[in-house]
């Protein structure tokens, strides 16, 4: 019967059955007959139509063998399938469904031996499978995913494959089997990119085998996995018997756990082997060069972590040094290291998307904390994320901060005052429970904000392009600005409000609907994020990954329009803003920023624009080559920042912490920017010194006085002139005030740390001033402004004198460009390249008012917009009125190298000729002085006028401090006729003072030219009598000015440049005869331009000449008399010394009648009246003595 049945079978069935050897029922490790298997493979390969029938027959036989527990037959069937797949891989789609059906039957048997035997078949199936079949047949795809799911479930540590809980060794065998199947899928290049759903099933099972509370265990697994990869990736062998004896010939590098004798130790070793296999599986998934696979695996990893967080598992913890660690952070970083370099950014982007999709509720805040910690750990690591869009990630983080601060129930409203320790809490139990929840919610929200701002800072760890840091900070500051389109010209409008309350209201009105940081907590978070960016981008110790990278400095222009944050109503915002600015000054400025910047010079292209500009110049014509590049807009940040400092000193004078904050900010500005900050800070400080007398209480006066003299103290330290008379005067006054307790404790040098000054806006313990000393002592002001400026200029010249640097080898992007702008001065001469530019010197000596600063910024902004909107500008083609040609066809601006004549100077030249009398040849063109307006009326029109100038009879026009200078017509009330009654020129003093340094500029004047006039300081609010000025004791500290004392005058002093013996500077001029001097001594009258003379002075009649000579004699007598009496102005800051050694002052306030013409000043008479003893140092006679009147 059996023989008849065998003869009736088809040939393929007969060939298959001949492959099965005769074995016992329970036999294992059975192999097919080799000769019959070879014939079967030849038959299947030669007749492909029979392969599908072979697969169907094997499927039926496997079902019978599995039912009868014929393990040997099942093993033979699996080996036949493996041989068929490897022999005919192209025909696999014909019987692939049968293979999956056989594997599914074996998996359902729950027999560990049969399932382990199916792994080689599944590996061959995954290796040779065609992915197109999965895409074409959805039923087949579902069948494949079912098999993968069943294999993956075997690796679970929580679910059991059998009906009963297996023993430890059996459980490890099940898990290893599942992990091997997962590794087969991950290793297949064809199946890895087909269905991402398989990783949703496989990755969680892998992570379960890697889950541990010991991070060191993960390091061991990773080390062993990497070692196995280097040694060839040999698969782990099956667990051997515990009784195995190690022979002497065996290798000595055995795991020490394997040498133990107990089963527990062997179980630990087996557990470690399973973990290594799981680590290899996870690595195999992430190393694939498939971005979709990396994305799917990352999503599965994040889901697993979120499940563990919801189960109250600790996946992230903070170390003692503040760094985040934990299982989640470790696995996230490992996945990023394994991923291909070009696909690593996919992991971070996936994590950011997961963070944005998480519901933002108090219950889910822990999920946000964990995700933010993982993102921050990846950003701050040494893993390079090539291809990452930094700005997109930054905007996502900012958007998430916005969501956090807009959560219902502001965290600030949930704060409650803690009860005293040791006393029972009077609140009820339900109230306490609610309070605990509220406090926990506040703490978690703070933690989320802290981690988000740290993530923003960690974005700066790796620099992927030159302007990355600048773009990041600019984006954050743009979100902080009240309006989206905020410009420099609009920033002064926001500064017109004096009080913080009005500024807050204006800010609320101007805030854009999409403005991000309307809340105080968000402003603080943004400013701290900026500080974090600056700290991370400029580490004290460079990372190895950033040594070869270069980037651009963060320019000062990004801070334009942000100074209003210093005037915010909340003290923490003011402190955070000052901290961010000081961090920028500390980390982003270089030694080049300490040098004086000359805005009047030609702008220089950025380094990275040089190559492009050079290539462009080769391709353009000569006409277009004359076109200049667009100027970099000038920053007004320092001007407006000092204005905000001035406002804060007045508005927040009640808070000592605000004074300390301003002291720290001013000290950092002086330390890092030098004269570039002093040019704006010194006039403001002198203006603030004048406002001390307006303070209502003694403590207010002490605070303002400490801030003012603290600034002077900084100058003496930074510019190293403590040993001069000026420096000793400043330090002696500081010592005197400290001895009288008229000083704020924190105003010191070196400055205290910002974290130690407390929170601005908080009232601290008020120091008690001694009442007896308040009535008797006074704060002596410092008024030697000209001498102080000369000390600063001289020290600057000495400190900047250094050997010239060699040019850079290539114009590549470097890290040495200054912050204050890309404009550099033209090639200077040897004598003046290290001197302070004259317009900066004049600015330090100029008046300072709040309105003048705002007007100057507005005027400069309008000028920049007008000049930038047309092709012919002053800085480019010189097509405007200032840059036009003179009448003789000569362009005076083209050849003038002195910055005095520039139209962008803050103040006009104060010499009669304004430095426009250039040194020229006697046979060349006649010197044509080019004033600010370039008007022909301001030129020397006759020889008689030249005689008047050289003899000193033609006085310079009054110096003005506005944006419009020398624009009055002939009928102006401030003309030369009423020169004696001009309130801006009441004091005229020589500048020979003890401790003062003569002003040696690079402008060489003739010895007979009149001295240059400079303002010293703004006049005091409150008149000071002559007796007080001469050495009176003055009023007490708590004195307050009366309305009668509020008359204001302006005091000027002449800084004589001295005689210059340089014959090359000015051509020699023959001496003028006495008769000609008498003829030219008339009082000029007319326009302050100095270019026209009235008809009375130019008349050839003898009567007019006699009147001029009489006027000349009266002028000489009046000048000598004026030099012998004290000034009648309110208070001359140069007359503080007392005695015969104080500087002299002259005044024309009490001249003749109204019909009397103003006299001309005789230079010889003026020089004869100078005291020869001026300049001698007698202790503190002229500086800091008690003879000064108080505020």
Swiss-Prot record:
Cited SUPFAM superfamilies: ARM repeat
Record GO cellular component, one term: plasma membrane
Comp. bias intervals (Acidic residues): 1054-1065
GO terms under biological process: protein localization to plasma membrane
Domain of life the protein comes from: Eukaryota
Biased composition regions of type Low complexity, renumbered to the chain: 800-811, 867-891, 1085-1108, 1116-1126
Residue ranges of the region described as Disordered: 484-503, 800-824, 861-940, 953-1160
Database matches in Pfam families: EFR3
Family: Belongs to the EFR3 family.
PANTHER family per UniProt: PROTEIN EFR3 (PTHR47766:SF1)
Name of protein: Protein EFR3
Species, as recorded: Chaetomium globosum (strain ATCC 6205 / CBS 148.51 / DSM 1962 / NBRC 6347 / NRRL 1970) (Soil fungus)
Gene symbol of the encoding locus: EFR3
């Amino acid at each position: 019967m059996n023989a008849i049945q065998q003869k009736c079978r088809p040939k393929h069935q007969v060939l298959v059955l001949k492959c099965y050897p005769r074995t016992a029922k329970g036999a294992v490790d059975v192999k097919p007959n080799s000769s019959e298997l070879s014939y079967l493979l030849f038959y299947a390969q030669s007749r492909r139509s029979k392969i599908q029938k072979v697969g169907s027959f094997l499927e039926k036989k496997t079902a019978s063998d599995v039912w009868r527990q014929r393990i040997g037959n099942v093993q033979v069937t699996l080996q036949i399938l493996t041989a068929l797949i490897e022999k005919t891989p192209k025909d696999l789609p014909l019987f692939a469904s049968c293979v999956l059906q056989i594997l599914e039957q074996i998996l359902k048997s729950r027999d560990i031996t049969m399932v382990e035997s199916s792994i080689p078949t599944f590996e061959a199936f995954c290796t040779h499978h065609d992915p197109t079949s999965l895409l074409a047949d959805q039923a087949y795809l579902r069948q494949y995913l079912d098999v993968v799911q069943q294999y993956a479930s075997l690796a679970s540590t929580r679910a059991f494959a059998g009906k009963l809980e297996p023993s430890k060794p059996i459980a490890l065998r099940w898990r290893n089997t599942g992990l091997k199947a997962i590794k087969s899928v991950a290793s297949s290049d064809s199946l890895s990119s087909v269905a991402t759903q398989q990783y949703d099933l496989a990755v969680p099972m892998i992570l379960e085998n890697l889950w541990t509370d010991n991070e060191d265990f993960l390091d061991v697994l990773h080390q062993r996995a990497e070692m196995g990869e280097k040694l060839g990736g040999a698969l782990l062998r099956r667990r051997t018997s515990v009784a195995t004896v190690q022979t002497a010939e065996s290798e000595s590098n055995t795991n020490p756990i394997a040498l133990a004798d107990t089963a527990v130790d062997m179980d630990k070793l087996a557990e470690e082997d399973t973990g290594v296999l799981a680590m290899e599986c996870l690595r195999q998934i992430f190393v694939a060069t498939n971005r979709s696979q990396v994305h799917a695996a990352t999503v599965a990893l994040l889901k697993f972590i979120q499940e563990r967080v919801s189960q109250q598992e600790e996946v992230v913890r903070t170390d003692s040094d503040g760094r985040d660690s934990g299982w989640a952070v470790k696995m996230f970083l490992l996945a990023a290291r394994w991923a291909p370099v070009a696909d690593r950014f996919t992991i971070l982007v996936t994590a950011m998307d997961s963070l944005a999709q998480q519901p933002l509720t108090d219950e889910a805040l822990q999920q946000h904390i964990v995700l933010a910690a993982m993102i921050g750990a990846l950003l701050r690591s040494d893993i390079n994320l090539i291809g990452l869009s930094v700005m997109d990630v930054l905007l996502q983080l900012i958007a998430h901060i916005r969501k956090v601060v807009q959560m219902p129930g502001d965290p600030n409203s949930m704060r409650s005052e803690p009860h005293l320790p040791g006393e029972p809490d009077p609140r009820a139990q339900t109230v306490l429970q609610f309070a605990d929840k509220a406090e926990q919610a506040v703490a978690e929200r703070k933690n989320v904000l802290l981690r988000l701002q740290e993530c923003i800072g960690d974005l700066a760890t790796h620099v992927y392009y030159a302007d990355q840091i600048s773009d990041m900070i600019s984006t954050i500051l743009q979100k902080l600005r009240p309006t989206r389109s905020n410009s420099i010209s609009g920033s002064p409008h926001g500064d017109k409000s004096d009080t913080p309350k009005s500024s807050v209201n204006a800010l609320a009105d101007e805030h854009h609907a999409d403005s991000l940081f309307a809340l105080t907590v968000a402003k603080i978070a943004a400013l701290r994020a900026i500080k974090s960016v600056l700290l991370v981008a400029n580490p004290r110790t460079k990372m190895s990954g950033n040594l070869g990278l270069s980037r651009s400095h963060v320019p000062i222009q990004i801070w334009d329009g942000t100074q209003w944050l210093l005037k915010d109503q909340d003290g923490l915002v003011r402190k955070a803003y000052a901290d961010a600015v000081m961090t920028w000054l500390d980390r982003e400025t270089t030694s080049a920023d300490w040098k004086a910047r000359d805005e009047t010079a030609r702008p220089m292209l950025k380094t990275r624009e040089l190559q492009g500009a050079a290539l462009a110049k080769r391709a353009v014509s000569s006409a277009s080559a004359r076109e200049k590049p667009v100027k970099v807009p000038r920053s007004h940040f320092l001007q407006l920042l000092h204005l905000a400092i001035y406002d804060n000193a007045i508005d927040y004078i009640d808070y000592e912490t605000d004074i300390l904050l301003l002291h720290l900010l001013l000290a950092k500005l002086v330390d890092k920017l030098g004269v570039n900050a002093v040019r704006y800070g010194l006039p403001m400080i002198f203006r603030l010194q004048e406002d001390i007398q307006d303070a209502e209480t003694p403590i207010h006066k002490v605070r303002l006085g400490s801030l003012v003299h603290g600034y002077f103290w900084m100058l003496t330290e930074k510019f190293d002139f403590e040993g001069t008379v000026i420096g000793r005067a400043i330090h002696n006054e500081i010592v005197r005030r400290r001895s009288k307790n008229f000083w704020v404790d924190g105003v010191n040098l070196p400055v205290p740390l910002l974290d130690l000054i407390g929170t601005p806006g908080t009232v601290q313990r008020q120091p008690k001033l001694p009442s007896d000393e308040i009535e008797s002592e006074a704060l002596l002001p410092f008024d030697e402004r000209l001498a102080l400026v000369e000390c600063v200029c001289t020290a600057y010249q000495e400190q900047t004198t250094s050997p010239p640097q060699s040019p850079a080898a290539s114009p590549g992007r470097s890290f040495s460009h200054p912050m204050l702008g890309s404009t550099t001065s033209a090639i200077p001469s040897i004598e003046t390249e290290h001197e302070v530019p004259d317009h900066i010197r004049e600015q330090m000596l100029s008046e300072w008012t709040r309105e003048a600063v705002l007007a100057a910024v507005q005027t400069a902004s309008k000028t920049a917009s007008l000049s930038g909107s047309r092709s012919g500008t002053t800085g480019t083609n010189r097509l405007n009125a200032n840059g036009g040609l003179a009448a003789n066809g000569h362009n005076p601006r083209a050849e003038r190298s002195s910055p005095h004549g520039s139209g962008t100077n803050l103040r006009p030249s104060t010499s009669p000729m304004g430095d426009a009398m250039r040194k020229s040849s006697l046979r060349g063109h006649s010197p044509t002085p080019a004033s600010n307006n370039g008007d022909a009326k301001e030129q020397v029109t006759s020889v008689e006028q030249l005689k008047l100038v050289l003899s000193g009879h033609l006085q310079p026009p009054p110096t003005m401090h506005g944006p419009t200078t020398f624009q009055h017509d002939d009928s102006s009330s401030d003309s030369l006729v009423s020169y004696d009654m001009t309130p801006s020129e009441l004091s005229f003093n020589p500048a020979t003072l003890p401790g003062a340094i003569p002003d040696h500029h690079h402008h060489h004047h003739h010895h007979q030219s009149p001295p240059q006039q400079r303002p010293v300081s703004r006049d005091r609010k409150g008149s000071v009598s002559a007796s007080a000025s001469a050495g009176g004791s003055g009023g007490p500290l708590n004195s307050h000015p009366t309305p009668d004392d509020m008359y204001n005058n302006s005091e000027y002093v002449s800084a004589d440049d001295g005689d210059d013996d340089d014959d090359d500077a000015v051509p020699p001029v023959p001496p003028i005869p006495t008769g000609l001097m008498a003829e030219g001594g008339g009082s000029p009258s007319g326009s302050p331009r100095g270019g026209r003379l009235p008809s009375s002075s130019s008349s050839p009649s003898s009567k007019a000449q006699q009147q001029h000579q009489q006027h000349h004699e009266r002028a000489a007598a009046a000048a000598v008399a004026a030099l012998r009496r004290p000034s009648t102005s309110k208070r001359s800051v140069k007359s503080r010394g007392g005695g015969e050694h104080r500087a002299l002052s002259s005044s024309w306030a009490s001249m003749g009648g109204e019909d009397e013409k103003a006299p001309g000043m005789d230079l010889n008479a003026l020089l004869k009246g100078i005291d020869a003893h001026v300049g001698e140092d007698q202790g503190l006679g002229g500086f800091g003595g008690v003879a000064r009147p108080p505020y």
